[in-house]
Structures are given as structure tokens and as C-alpha cells.
Amino acid sequence: MATPHINAVEGAFAETVLFPGDPLRAKYIAETFLENVEQVTDVRNMLGFTGTYKGKRISVMGSGMGIPSCSIYATELIKDYGVKNLIRVGTCGAISTDVKVRDVIIGMGACTDSQVNRLRFKGQDFAAIADYSLLSAVVESAKTHGIQTRVGNVFSADLFYTPDPEMFDVMEKMGVLGVEMEAAGLYGVAHEFGARALCVVTVSDHIRTGEKTTSDERQTTFNDMIIMTLDAAINL
């Protein structure tokens, strides 16, 4: 039952899918943390895998960069493959001095400069929020693992190279924790089609200070985030 962008067979995906932007990161997660792994889709090299984690069937698939790409895959996973839970796992940039590089952020809500949710909400402002049961499960898992998290708003930007850097001042004033490019679209799709979604990201760089993580630091922090998320996923 292939879709225009996914060539998996019916039943290939688990009810819960971890959803990194990078398909190679999806491959890394599958090969590092899952057992009995099978690659289930590879259209446009947007790789997807299904395996087991501590006996629980889990899938992982790349979403691509930005709301349009993420929304395509999220829609098809939910509507055509029956996926119930989508958890974005990725990275973000920080803007506030209170937020540090390597912090783990859980996106309770997602602000955006994109118009996609206004389009689906007939011109009105839609509150793009995470599913509470997913959020609380990941928060509790983080506590169990001793991983400190920050819970609040992220900002899903349409432009990576923004022409309006003064907007960062507004974001900081309004308490936005991190800037990424997918969560608002993912939350909108999930609400539209009756699924549950959450965004969990690590801070890879600081927009204000220019501080960046090394590749080794990024991988270590990312691994901690994945383990905490997977341990939450098996209890959904």
C-alpha cells in the first residue's frame, strides 16, 4: 500500500514512530538502539525502519527538514499506515542565556512564522501544542534517567537563514526556549488527523553566543535523549 512518498507495505510501521529530520540519523537510531531491525521504506532515501526496543515494536523514520517535508511524511504515516504516536527527536538553536548548549528541550507548544496551521484552521490562530500524555511520559522518563529537561515553547521557523534577526529578541522576551523547523507543522497534522505528537530536541548551538557542540558532544547528548524517549515510548 505504497503512498507517493513511502513504499512500505501495510502494517510495516509500529504505532509509535520516532521522527528525526535526518534519514541517516533514523538509520543510526535503528541500528544502535533497536533489535530485529528491518528497513521498511526508502523513497527518495528518506529511510524508515521498524524493530523492537525492550520487546516493544517501535519504528523510526526521517522527516526531512522543514514543515512541508515533515507534514508530508506525518500525514501519510498517520492516514495510510495507522501510526498513533509521532515523536520528533532532533536538535535546535538556543536564544536565551538561560538555555545552555546540550540542554534537552521538550516542546510543550510550538510558535511559528509559517501559515500552515492558519490554513488548516480557516484563517484563525491554532494553538499548536504537544499531546499531554506523550509529554508527561517523556518528562517522567527523563527524571528516571536523571536527565534535566526544559519544558516550554519552541519556535518552528520557515527560514533557516532569517532576514530578521531582531525577531530573536522578541522570542527571548516571550520565553521561547529553542528554534527549530518542524514542530508546529507536526502538531498541526497530528491534531488534524487524530494522532498524538511531541517534539524533543537537544540544543546543538547557541544563536546569541555562537557556542556550538562538537560532533562527539552532540552524539552523547543525542543518545541520552533517544534512550529517555524510547523508554517513554514502550509505556505508551
Swiss-Prot record:
It is an enzyme of class 2 (transferase). Phosphate binds at residues 21, 25, 44, 88-91. GO terms for cellular component: cytosol. Its EC number is 2.4.2.1. The record marks 218 as: Important for catalytic activity. The active site is at residue 205. One of its GO terms (molecular function) is purine-nucleoside phosphorylase activity. It comes from the Bacteria. Keywords: Glycosyltransferase, Transferase. It catalyses: a purine D-ribonucleoside + phosphate = a purine nucleobase + alpha-D-ribose 1-phosphate; a purine 2'-deoxy-D-ribonucleoside + phosphate = a purine nucleobase + 2-deoxy-alpha-D-ribose 1-phosphate. The keyword NADP does not apply. Pfam families: PNP_UDP_1. GO terms for biological process: purine nucleoside catabolic process. The keyword Transferase applies. A purine D-ribonucleoside binds at residues 5, 180-182, 204-205. NCBIfam families: deoD (TIGR00107), PRK05819.1 (NF004489), PRK13374.1 (NF009914). Belongs to the PNP/UDP phosphorylase family. Catalyzes the reversible phosphorolytic breakdown of the N-glycosidic bond in the beta-(deoxy)ribonucleoside molecules, with the formation of the corresponding free purine bases and pentose-1-phosphate. Homohexamer; trimer of homodimers. This is Purine nucleoside phosphorylase DeoD-type.
